[in-house]
Regions:
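TRNA-binding/sensing appendages of the translation machinery
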Residues: 1-82, 86, 94
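A residue-level signal for conserved active-site and pocket-lining positions in enzyme catalytic cores
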Residues: 33, 88, 106, 128
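Short secondary-structure capping/junction motifs at helix and strand boundaries
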Residues: 38, 97-104
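Cofactor- and metal-binding active-site motifs of prokaryotic enzymes
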Residues: 84, 108, 124
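A surface-exposed, charged beta-strand/loop segment in the N-terminal or early-internal portion
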Residues: 86, 109, 119
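Beta-strand scaffold of nucleotide-dependent catalytic cores
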Residues: 104-107, 115
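Short glycine/proline-enriched loop/turn "hinge" motifs that connect secondary-structure elements
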Residues: 115-122
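Single conserved hydrophobic/aromatic residue that forms the stacking wall/gate
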Residues: 125-134
């Protein structure tokens, strides 16, 4: 019996020339941001669902229709992060009391949308520079 191994619908691999372009963009982004003393951060792909709901907004399409969330062993609802704002806000709230905090990040985000050309369930998000002092 032949097994069909394929991508999950709405996802894609990045490789070859497309990967080279992607790496170039990421490198330029970090280079420019570092010139302005922004610090990079890597946050978990999983977040508490209520955190995302509060920071993004309960009534937004992201929370009401597009978020991948599930009950984690009957303890709490968690989700695959749909964007970076919630993770950056959580980090800032729990790690900094005062002062200037300039953070940047990039990484995979997940949205349950109807797949179509150019729109994927898994996307790479490059955060805009975050400045909680503004």
């Amino acid at each position: 019996m032949k097994r069909n191994i394929s991508l999950v619908k709405g996802t894609h691999d990045i490789h070859g020339a497309e990967m080279e372009k992607f790496e170039f963009i990421i490198e330029k982004f970090y280079s420019v941001c570092r010139n302005f003393n922004f610090k990079s951060i890597q946050t978990p792909i999983l977040e508490q669902q209520d955190l995302v709901s509060r920071t993004v907004g309960e009534q937004t399409d992201i929370v009401s229709k597009e978020m991948y969330s599930f009950l984690d062993k009957g303890e709490a609802y968690i989700c695959l992060r749909p964007e970076a704002t919630s993770s950056l806000a959580r980090f800032a709230a729990s790690n900094y009391q005062s002062g200037l905090l300039k953070l940047i990040t990039h990484g995979p985000m997940f949205r349950r949308e109807r797949p179509q050309k150019g729109r994927y369930l898994s996307l790479i998000h490059i955060s805009e520079p975050t400045r909680p002092d503004v």
